[in-house]
Amino acid sequence: MLFSESSVSNDCTYKGRKLYGRILLVSSNPDLRVRSVNSIPDLRVQTVTTVPSRCGEWQMVTSNPDLRVQIDPSFGEFTIQFVESFPGVGP
C-alpha cells in the first residue's frame, strides 16, 4: 500500500481526529490503524508522561482515551515512527 504525504494534515489531524492526546493501544476495534516504520513516517510519535499538548505527543493510558489505536505491521491508514524528541507531522 502506498502512503501519501498528505494523509496526515499539517494541523495534526487525520479524518478530523487529532493525533495527540491520551492513547489506548488496542488489538481490535480501533479508531485508527497505523503502521510503525523506521524512517520517513507520516507522523513522528513521542510517548510522554505529562499532559500531551503538541502534535505527535502520545500519553499511553489504560482507560478514558482520546483515541484508540491499533498498530498493524502490514497495513495502516498512515505510518508512524516512535521518536525520543521532535514529534510531529512528516519526516
Model regions and ranges:
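Repetitive, compositionally biased segments used for assembly/scaffolding
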Residues: 2-91
